[in-house]
Amino acid sequence: DRGFLHCDLLIIGAGPAGLAAALTAGRAGSQVILADEDFTLDGRLNSEQLAFGDQSGADWAAQTVAELASLPNVRIMARTTVLGAFDHGIFGALERVSDHLPQPAPGKPRQVLWRIYTKGSLLCAGATERPIAFENNDRPGIMLAGAMRSYANRWAVTPAQRVAVFTNNDDGHQTAADLHAKGVAIAAVIDVRPDAPLSGDYEVIAGGQVINSRGRLGLKSIEVALPGGGKRQLSCGALGVAGGWNPNVHLTSHHRGRPEWLPQIAAFGPAAEGPKALRVAGAAKGDLSTAGALRGGADEAASWLRENGFRASRLELPEAEGAPISITPFWAVKGCNRAWLDQQNDVTVKDVKLAHQENFVSVEHLKRYTTLGMATDQGKTSNMGGLAIMAELTGKAIPEVGTTIFRPPYTATVIGAFG
């Protein structure tokens, strides 16, 4: 089915930033649409063990959603992906109405493609974790550390009884700490930083690197290069890989805006010249702290409200984790070839090296020669690694190499929805 909606402010994403923004705008009396692709409205708050004052982050999110649901001027759209930003403040959004039901209700469509007309919009789409490339990193049991943490905290599931974590930033240590607290054995945290923090009652190999994996039908062990030389085998059934977080800036590029480099998080942030009246807050803007996301979402919403004739009061926010993430950029283990960057299109480090050898060094040529980032995810986890490796091969800084931009739809969409 298809439909049309109008609002003052469209808020895209219902994590900490989106919820704070929606609460600010909703209390001010503006017509608000809050859209999120998940079936719960909390972003990563259900995936983390975060304290919001004297309550958990997940409880704060549930309390906030309950208040928003009680406001007649706020429309909450779960299971709704805002898939494109178009001219004149128009957005396309796909609502999955009955895909999740074993038996759809009579008269209900499978999906609805909404055309949303807005006066303003706020992108609070969060960030996507990226991997680190190493030899044979496609073996079952190797996954992103944030996903491993989500399984544990949100679903009470662990991929193995003994896990290891490979990281270049503090966030990887949080995965180990959360799993350890739930009784999962931690083989080790392998941190490429020589000054890696000691985060718990388990081994931390500072300055180490995972250089290979082994196992016939799944991961059985990893090979670790030690900082002082030599190698070591670690037995584990799963490996969480934490290479940093990329802001989900896709909608800011739908009017040809080009993402800009943010050295503090070693990732590309939102384009300065994005769609008209589209603001960005939270992790999508490069602020990876929870406190920063909360305040950023509330402040961006309040700023828009004041500019458009609404009276916005300052939102009282709970105390939350506010430390900036510490990261050392590390994209791929030296000397690896059979190391996957884009697992959907089977693009390896070797393919990027071959593209450089054949002089396909422009990011647009690299993309088309290797198909890096041309799968249905548009390179959400893979692009940064490939671009960083090409930058190293050409002797340039990553901002000089640049990045490709994104086009609608944000995620793969059923063709029939456009009919």
Residue ranges of predicted features:
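Residues forming the flavin
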Residues: 1-419
